[in-house]
Amino acid sequence: MTGFFYFCTMKKTFKPGTMIYPLPVVMVSCGDSPDTYNIITVAWTGTICSDPPMCYISIRKDRHSHPIISRTKEFVINLTTDALAKATDWCGVRSGRDHDKFKEMHLTPEPAQVVKAPLIAESPLNIECKVVEIKELGSHDMFIAEVVAVNGDEKYFDPSTGLFQLNQADLITYSHGKYYTLGEKIGKFGFSVEKIQHKRKK
């Protein structure tokens, strides 16, 4: 058929599964008193609404943090970095039933602004959340939450603009069982339709 081109790629079909990668990997801190503080590493997390700011985490019922967050209805999402990679992984493969994760990973619990759950001081950005709904889905329960405060490490603020430079924090991501650092910037939001500014000749 003249004027039409057919391009076929060879695709292999997988069984249904979670293949949306890469993902953020975060340490979620919870508990309302020092004797109940715990950290769980979560990759099933993300933003679900801008206004009001809302996010979610999904946790298996048998995880130690599940009943803690179900009871307190709050948690803190702590972004993770290259320097925190070992602690991030360790907090995901060890149980708070058997370990004091803050102590054993040399992490510092810090008071939050709104919630009783602690911040992780070593994290560059801490997002305080209050649970508004728990949805039972299957292997995991989804904790839908409203963001009630955000705390950023002062060293990442640009003194001249006051903007928070998260790109300087060496954040890590998770993809199919492995951790990665982020690569180089390839564009910015809207760059595909941005008009090129030509300098006028003098």
Task: Describe these PLM feature segments.
Residues 6-202:
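Basic, polyanion-binding surface patches
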